[in-house]
Regions:
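N-terminal amphipathic alpha-helix/helix-capping segment at the start of soluble metabolic enzymes
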Residues: 7-57, 309-319
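Short, well-ordered coil/turn segments that N-cap beta-strands
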Residues: 52-56, 84-88, 122-128, 144-146, ...
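Glycine-rich, proline-tolerant flexible connector loops at the mouths of alpha/beta enzymes
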Residues: 58-70, 88-110, 275-289
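A short alpha/beta connector and helix-capping loop motif
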Residues: 70-74, 78, 138, 143-153, ...
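Alpha-helix-loop-beta-strand connector modules within alpha/beta enzyme cores
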Residues: 77-79, 83-84, 105-129, 164-170, ...
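Active-site-adjacent loop and "lid" segments of alpha/beta metabolic enzymes
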Residues: 103-111, 147-154, 210-217, 238-265, ...
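Catalytic beta/alpha-barrel core
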Residues: 107-109, 124-137, 146-159, 169-181, ...
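Catalytic alpha/beta core domains of metabolic enzymes, predominantly
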Residues: 167-275
Length: 320
């Protein structure tokens, strides 16, 4: 739900039709009564970054937008966390450094972006994740967020991996679209060796010719077994059609539910889902974000599937 200056409470599917600047200003949001997320920002986040941890979720808009929108999404995630008993980490990027077109919006930048993320944490208690692109960004980012993320295109950059690990924060490394699952062992070891509190690896599809991605459902077991780290499924970037649009990536968001359900049945340890009240109006990844109103119903199905899955004794890469 979201509250506007006139005191009215709006359903999430109404938010997309609203002027988001009309939502409650940031200095009043922290005063609203809230239920807390299952895992709050702080040291307890680290326990998620081990094989056998409870199932969890990374979610949020692709890029940081207005405080009103960021907090609308974060508040919804905090309620989902509480209602479903699901640990949730809020994600959003301060800089989309690999946009297809030089004219595409990139985000607010490091300083403003970290301030926006801090306001999300103050308002909701949610743990925070954001990605880093340069080694010199890591220390400042680690002062604000709970988890650093390495983008897929940078998953072999040793200096960046080491700098992220040296912060002592947990690190999520996205698997490059050209990488095999077991090849991610090198990235995991670089981060661990530098002192990270934990490491997770995220599957986000593999190139299948030009402009297409496919997901090998064996990847979760293979990565977990080879790298001794939780294997996450990115259900939104996996439906991208890279380079398909005119200067932007395309996407097939209608396939998100099927891939997410399959990944959980195949043993994914956690999910990564970008979500927005109105993806078409987002500043980035408009063609592959999940509508915020669709998130809870999908997660309810996912948790039912997760509860049903029991590893076979001989199964490769069991969750532990």
């Amino acid at each position: 739900m979201a509250e506007s200056r006139d005191g009215r409470v709006h359903a999430l599917d109404e938010v997309a039709e609203m002027d988001l600047d009309a939502l409650l200003p940031e200095d009043e949001i922290a005063a609203l009564a809230r239920r807390g997320p299952v895992v709050k920002s702080g040291p307890e986040v680290t326990r998620l970054f081990r094989v056998g941890a409870p199932f969890w979720l990374i979610a949020g808009p692709c890029v940081l937008e207005s405080d009103a929108l960021n907090l609308t999404v974060a508040e919804a995630l905090a309620r989902i966390s509480d209602d479903l008993g699901l640990p949730v980490i809020f994600k959003a990027s301060f800089d989309k450094a690999n946009r297809s077109s030089p004219g595409s919006p990139r985000g607010p930048g490091v300083d403003e972006g970290l301030a926006k993320l801090a306001r999300v944490r103050a308002a909701t208690g949610l743990p925070l994740l954001t990605d880093v692109h340069l080694p010199e960004q890591c220390e400042a980012v680690a002062e604000v967020v709970d988890v650093l993320q390495i983008p897929a295109f940078l998953c072999r950059q040793t200096d960046l991996l080491v700098a992220a690990g040296q912060t002592g924060r947990p690190v999520n490394v996205k698997k490059g679209q050209w990488m095999g699952p077991a090849e991610m062992k090198g990235a995991a070891n670089k981060v661990r060796g530098a002192g990270a509190a934990g490491v997770a690896l995220t599957e986000r599809g593999t190139f299948f010719g030009y402009g297409n991605l496919v997901v090998d459902m064996r990847s979760f077991a293979l990565m977990r077994q080879a790298c001794e780290a939780p294997a996450i499924f990115d259900g939104t970037h996996s439906v991208q059609r890279p380079g398909e649009g005119a200067g932007v990536s395309g996407g097939e968001p209608g396939h998100i539910p099927a891939l997410v359900r399959a990944a959980v049945a195949a043993g994914a340890d956690a999910l990564f889902l970008e979500t927005h009240p109105d993806p078409a109006k987002g500043l980035s990844d408009t063609t592959n974000m999940l509508p915020l109103a669709r998130l809870r119903p999908l997660l309810e199905q996912v948790l039912e599937i997760r509860a049903m899955v029991r590893p076979f004794e001989w199964e490769a890469g069991a969750r532990g």
